[in-house]
């Protein structure tokens, strides 16, 4: 059987028509019920005079930067507990984790939580930007350094997070669904991918709090040179190297030489090649099957994003295994 090849070369970017930075379908501040808007202004101590809805990401919660009459700025996230039950639960979970994270982890800080018919998170607003797309080396280096430092700060894992492979158990059986997909590879290659994915519990075990969703729309680069890690709704417990590896999916799709990046990233360079392949196989199976599900009306770009990620990860794994 072919073994992993850490000397795999970069390839051309994976084609996509995703409008990076404009993928979210969201309501505006004005669509919040009057009482909720009144409660927000009461908590913040000043009337809202302007708002700017954020359009990155794939979650259809209200997300907007509020400008108050006193000149301050605040970030608001909100979801209806009736019309958006799962997203409201996600915001509650995010609020709980933001209160759990140690101060040494750079993130957007929670200032207020309103929990009624609407779950509303009020967060500190920081003048920051998203990484450039396509990914640039300087942005990627900054983000990897921040994510690696956070892994140290989050070991041992604070709070009560489920193990990586338990929370994401659905990743492991996806290659059964893809059986017979000749466009993806030979039957033996697909069988091998499934066997690799099945080893997820073994290779991902650890005692680090793992974000699992760090990418260009959850990493915010500050003018001072820092990086904020955002979107802490559903972290898990696992190996310290998982977040740096998962972060490389986007750059891989943009044509970055992720193997060279992997070799010079300390947390990744010491990981067994086969262990990396196991995670890549599980991810590829998940994305390549999820992208075929119906397109959610509230997130019209989600399936295209999953297709793009799936093709990027699968191509990366194929190059590492010598299947191309």
What are these language model-derived features?
Residues 2-52:
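Juxta-kinase regulatory segment immediately upstream of eukaryotic protein kinase catalytic domains
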Residues 42-50, 93, 174-176, 192-203:
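Short Pro/Gly-enriched beta-strand edge/turn motifs at strand-loop
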Residues 54-58, 113-116:
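A short beta-turn/loop motif at secondary-structure boundaries
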Residues 55-68, 74-76, 196-242:
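Active-site acidic catalytic loop and adjacent metal/ATP-binding pocket
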Residues 72-116, 132-150:
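A conserved alpha-helical element in kinase catalytic cores
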Residues 81, 116-136, 156, 172-181, ...:
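A glycine-centered beta->alpha junction motif in the catalytic cores
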Residues 241-270, 280-298:
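Active-site activation/catalytic loop segments of kinase-like enzymes and analogous catalytic loops
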């Amino acid at each position: 059987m072919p073994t992993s090849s850490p000397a795999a070369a970069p390839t051309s970017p994976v084609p996509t028509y995703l409008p990076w930075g404009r993928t979210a379908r969201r309501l505006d501040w004005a669509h919040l019920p009057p009482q909720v808007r009144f409660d927000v202004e009461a908590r913040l101590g000043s009337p809202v005079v302007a708002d700017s809805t954020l359009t990155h990401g794939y979650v259809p919660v209200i997300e907007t930067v509020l400008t108050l009459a006193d000149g301050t700025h605040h970030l608001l996230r909100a979801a209806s507990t009736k019309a958006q039950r799962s997203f409201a639960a996600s915001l509650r979970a995010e609020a709980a984790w933001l209160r759990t994270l140690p101060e040494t982890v750079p993130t957007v800080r929670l200032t207020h939580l309103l929990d009624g018919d609407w779950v509303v998170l009020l967060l500190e607003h920081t003048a920051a930007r998203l990484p450039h797309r396509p990914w640039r080396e300087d942005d990627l280096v900054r983000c990897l350094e921040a994510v690696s430092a956070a892994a140290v700060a989050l070991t041992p894992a604070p709070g009560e997070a489920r193990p990586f492979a338990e929370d994401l158990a659905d990743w492991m059986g996806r290659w059964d669904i893809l059986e017979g997909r000749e466009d993806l590879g030979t039957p033996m290659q697909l069988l091998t991918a499934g066997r690799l994915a099945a080893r997820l519990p073994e290779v991902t075990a650890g005692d680090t709090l793992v974000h699992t969703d760090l990418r260009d729309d959850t990493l915010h680069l500050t003018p001072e040179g820092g990086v904020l890690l955002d979107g802490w709704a559903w972290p898990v417990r696992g190996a310290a190297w998982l977040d740096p590896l998962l972060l490389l999916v986007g750059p891989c799709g943009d044509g970055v030489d992720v193997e060279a990046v992997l070799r010079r990233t300390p947390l990744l360079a010491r990981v067994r090649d086969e262990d990396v392949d196991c995670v890549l196989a599980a991810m590829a199976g998940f994305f390549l099957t999820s992208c075929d599900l119906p397109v959610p009306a509230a997130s019209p770009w989600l399936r295209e994003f999953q297709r793009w990620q799936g093709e990027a990860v699968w191509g990366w794994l194929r190059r590492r295994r010598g299947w191309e």
